[in-house]
């Protein structure tokens, strides 16, 4: 670890795929409480800008921090990627503090699209922020557009909170020129922020929250000490369904269960977690997980690898102390309990955006202060991989699981999805057959539309057959190529339970690079949040799908795009009753 005079921390990580990865602690959307919710997320969207033909890049805003990364591709170099990312924050050697109203307006529209996307596909309910005075969704809404001047002032104010002590930088390689460049830019920031937030959010403990969830989860408040952080790292590397959350200066260990009986035993104090010592902790974490640790605990004064001897040599005492603290929090009701609930009728409170939820007090009724049993935890394996064809009965359940667990990777190709994970076969089956997970997986049917229409365009099956068998196997096979005949009609209007645009496009020079560039152009215009595309077996032919509330504008953009010499697009209007009748007459797919 290299520490600049203003406390910027720089790490060399030659194993990461990114060229540069930057995080800003104490800079997430928890800072929006008592201001306009969404300022942090809007700032993230305003800052990131790059040439998608030369770079891969992304950014994210969480409760307590913001992070950005950039990777060079094609003819660009690592140095180009570093300078590109730094340019998001600095202009002419000074920290950016000017945002045009037109750009703010476009990105607010994009935020509304992101809200729509996330609520169609996920359950984006942030319990901790809600209990701390925020909303269940804190990513920004379209009504921000009514206060553009106030929003711009808040954005400038937020930029002035950035300080050297907040900055963490990972680089793949660090030469003298790069280090000097960092000193001239992030190293020029003040060591302490010029503007300090007026309040640090504090959540309310002793609550039971009934909300959609794939698991029965208990958030246990523990002290944010070094030993407890090392204990969390130990548990995370060894077991599944254990993680942590932070808000303000508070730390919670999150423990999830698939068995309601075990969950209730843990809550009543009659059972403790069965934590056993493993052979060795290697700290072989992803760069995302490492960055999150440094940002959530900015007071860490050493490289995490400096603690590898301590976490292994002192693991017994660390885990005993952590186990005792967990049990004390259970007894004292320093917990937040999440109980899976999928009823739209049950509600006893709402946030300012009128999202309904049930919040109850966690009482001491039935509490047992002497545990007499232990609960086994799911152990991690080194690696596992499965391939699932489109239309397989387990497809959507596996996608749901990958979306709910950050350590599951999913890659899509023309025939199906390849999933990498570290579960045993028995554990993954137990999860996917559990009552709460099955309800959660089926509670957001919108994600299915992407695969329904991919099946329609790529398999040659009729829309009636696909809809009649949407939960069973629809074979994709390389043995037969679907010859797609593009007719005169380029638009087919349907009614579904989500608003989206999808279809197939063909172009002589069409490739993934041009489609990524197109996606970013649509994002800059505020018309979409993201666009998925799959390369079909027919030459230069792609399937596109995007959730959007601006369906006509997106259709017009795609319909007039000169990269496509043939297209067949489906435009869905949201409604209570599905109607795909327009697809039965004119769309011809010859196998």
From Swiss-Prot:
Do you know what upregulates this one? Expressed in the late phase of the viral replicative cycle.
Primary residence: virion
Where does the UniProt annotation locate this protein?
A: Virion
GO molecular function list: metalloendopeptidase activity; zinc ion binding
In terms of superkingdom, the source organism counts as: Viruses
Q: How is it modified after translation?
A: Undergoes proteolytic processing during the course of infection. May be cleaved into 46 kDa and 22 kDa products (Potential).
Explain what the record says happens when changing residue 35 to A.
Answer: About 60% loss of processing activity
Which residues constitute the catalytic centre? 44
* Mutagenesis / variant outcome for changing residue 120 to A: No effect on processing activity
One GO-annotated biological process of the protein: viral life cycle
Q: How is the cofactor bound?
A: Binds 1 zinc ion.
What result follows from mutating residue 45 to A? Complete loss of processing activity
Using the UniProt record, name the top-level EC class of this enzyme in a single word: hydrolase
Job description of the protein: Probably involved in maturation of some viral proteins by processing them preferentially at Ala-Gly-|-Ser/Thr/Lys motifs. Does not seem to be responsible for the cleavage of major core proteins.
Q: Give the family, as the similarity comment puts it.
A: Belongs to the peptidase M44 family.
Name the UniProt record assigns to this protein: Metalloendopeptidase OPG085
Q: Which organism is it from?
A: Vaccinia virus (strain Western Reserve) (VACV)
Organism taxonomic ancestry: Viruses, Varidnaviria, Bamfordvirae, Nucleocytoviricota, Pokkesviricetes
